[in-house]
Design a protein with these regions (language model features):
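Flexible loop/turn connectors
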Residues: 1-100
Length: 100
């Protein structure tokens, strides 16, 4: 059944659209399925149910991106194969907190 379905949206806006359509169709979140997004937008806490989301430090992401670009310029590199990681945090809210 639906209880075994988890939805992860690539961004919070996609999740908001999905949640709106699901609720209008009579589904209950998180009872029928759970959903989480990525961005941790301020709307996550306003929407009902509140959306679980992955929080990224976008300022740190920007700083790290600038350092990578500066290093590429300094080394006169045309390589685009850089992998970089920054910590993220999951903000668990009602959209994944089924009581059943």
């Amino acid at each position: 059944g639906l209880k075994d379905i988890a939805i992860f949206g690539g961004n919070d806006y996609t999740c908001f659209g999905f949640m709106k359509a699901a609720l209008e169709s009579g589904y209950k979140i998180p009872d029928d399925f759970i959903i989480a997004g990525y961005d941790n937008l301020s709307f996550c806490e306003i929407f009902t149910p509140e959306l679980t989301s992955i929080a990224t430090d976008f300022h740190e992401l920007g700083k790290k991106s600038i350092r990578i670009i500066e290093n590429m310029v300094a080394e006169n590199s045309d390589s685009f194969g850089n992998i970089s990681m920054i910590p993220v945090e999951i903000k668990i809210r009602n959209s994944t907190n089924s009581k059943n």
